From Swiss-Prot:
Biological source species: Methylococcus capsulatus (strain ATCC 33009 / NCIMB 11132 / Bath)
Function: Displays ATPase and GTPase activities.
Similarity field: Belongs to the RapZ-like family.
NCBIfam families linked: PRK05416.1
Keywords recorded for this protein, A-Z: ATP-binding, GTP-binding, Nucleotide-binding
Name of the protein: Nucleotide-binding protein MCA0739
């Protein structure tokens, strides 16, 4: 039996994660009081029903504070039953959560007449710390769309698209923070920066003028060759380990030019029938993720 406990901050996408798992054949329960996890699992095991082979349970700040404080013991007892337990935790920057609640006009579960939204978000972070500190699967949804989140959930829990490993190439800007959900981070800030050419500043690494600017640099050429060689050498090893996903992030200062160019160039070089290739440009406007499929 496999159990995925889905937790995270309100507004971070927990409902979407549970819906995705349900679509993938998981028996899903949202907002189950934490002390009921163990008796539910005992009953599921006793039933010997294949319907309970894969279970997903949503646990969040709607649980009583005492239940969340005792979560580590509850998790330990669940594992003593022989259940393969994983914790998937979704989070986002406070500013993003504030914006999402403002746009949807939904009520945060911890707000009331005396607790404003910003304070409720901070309180929730404190309440969920016992769950967050034990999570082994993390997704930061600050910059993700619903489509991207669904794919990330499938990656994290081991349901790759089409039965293949998902390889995600992601560009980002260091000034906006390093992605939390990545396996490799490469720093491209040492390369020539199109930002300092006035005519290129408003463009991105997808535009022909920026592509031409970077393509004629020997340093960019060498960087790309070495990065390609590294990934071509080690991707087969990850495939041999039956990994369901591999996330590679390339960053420059703002995530507009160099990192975008490198990700696009890598995608053209690495396309393979051995994995499902996804491209994501975190700092660019939508559409921000593309499936390059196989060839």
């Amino acid at each position: 039996m496999r159990l995925i406990i889905v937790s995270g901050f309100s507004g971070s996408g927990k409902s979407i994660a549970l819906d995705t798992l349900e679509d993938c054949g998981y028996y899903c329960i949202d907002n189950l009081p934490a002390p009921l996890i163990e008796p539910f699992l005992q009953q599921a095991i006793a039933s010997r029903s294949s319907a309970f082979d894969k279970i997903a349970i949503g646990i969040d700040a709607r649980n009583q504070s005492a239940n969340l404080t005792g979560f580590p013991d509850i998790l330990g007892r669940a594992r003593q039953l022989g259940v393969d337990c994983r914790i998937l935790f979704l989070q986002a920057e406070p500013e993003t959560l504030l914006k999402r609640f403002s746009e949807t006009r939904r009520k945060h579960p911890l707000t009331d007449a005396s607790v404003p939204l910003a304070e409720a978000i901070e309180l929730e972070r404190h309440l969920l710390e016992p769950v967050l500190s034990r999570a082994d699967l993390h997704i930061d949804t600050t910059y993700t769309t619903i489509h991207q989140l669904r794919e990330l959930v499938r990656q994290r829990v081991g349901i790759p698209s089409g039965g293949l490993m998902s390889l995600c190439l992601q560009s980002f800007g260091f000034k906006h923070g390093v992605p939390m959900d990545t396996d490799f981070v490469f720093d491209a800030r040492c390369l020539p920066n199109p930002h300092w050419t006035a005519s290129l500043r408003p463009k991105t690494g997808k535009d022909p003028e920026v592509v031409a600017f970077l393509a004629e640099s020997a340093d960019v050429h060498d960087y790309l060759n070495h990065l390609t060689a590294f990934l071509e050498r080690w991707i087969p090893c990850f495939l041999a380990e039956n990994r369901s996903y591999l996330n590679v992030s390339i960053g420059c200062t703002g995530g507009q030019h160099r990192s975008v160019y490198l990700v696009e160039a890598l995608a053209g070089r690495l396309n393979s029938d051995r994995y499902n290739l996804l491209v994501r440009h975190r700092e660019l406007p939508e559409p921000a993720e593309e499936s390059h499929g196989t060839k």
